[in-house]
C-alpha cells in the first residue's frame, strides 16, 4: 500500500509518496503528491479521507506533484486503499496526458 505521510512543503501537509520503496533507500529526494482539502473536481484528483488517516475529506492532487528532499518527510499517517491505488494510476495518466489505455475509463 502506498504511504500517506506528513511533509514540509508550503506548510506541513499530508502527501502521497510516489517514489517506489526500493528506490527510496538510494535516493536523497522523493516525489510526492500533495493532499488538499480544496477539491476542484478535476480528473487528476483522488478522493481520500478519514479512512486514510486524515482529519477530513480531501483529495490527492496529481497536478501539483513535487520532488522534495527525503528529510522533509515526516511520520506516516495512513495508506491508500487498493481502489485508491487504481484511481491514483488513472489520475497520473490523465494529469500528464499520457497516451495509455485506461481500464474502466468512464
Residue ranges and their predicted role:
Residues 1-4, 62:
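Loop/turn positions that initiate beta-strands
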Residues 3-4, 14, 94, 106:
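Small, basic N-terminal interaction modules of short regulatory proteins
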Residues 6-50:
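Compact nucleic-acid interaction/catalytic patches
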Residues 52-106:
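C-terminal terminal-subdomain/extension
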Amino acid at each position: 500500500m502506498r504511504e500517506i505521510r506528513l511533509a514540509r512543503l508550503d506548510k506541513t501537509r499530508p502527501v502521497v509518496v510516489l517514489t517506489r520503496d526500493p528506490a527510496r533507500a538510494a535516493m536523497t529526494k522523493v516525489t510526492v503528491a500533495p493532499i488538499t482539502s480544496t477539491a476542484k473536481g478535476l480528473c487528476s484528483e483522488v478522493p481520500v479521507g478519514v479512512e486514510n488517516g486524515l482529519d477530513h475529506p480531501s483529495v490527492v492532487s496529481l497536478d501539483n506533484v513535487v520532488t522534495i528532499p527525503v528529510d522533509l518527510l515526516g511520520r506516516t499517517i495512513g495508506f491508500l486503499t487498493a481502489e485508491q491505488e487504481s484511481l491514483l494510476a488513472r489520475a497520473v495518466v490523465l494529469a500528464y496526458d499520457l497516451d495509455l489505455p485506461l481500464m474502466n475509463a468512464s
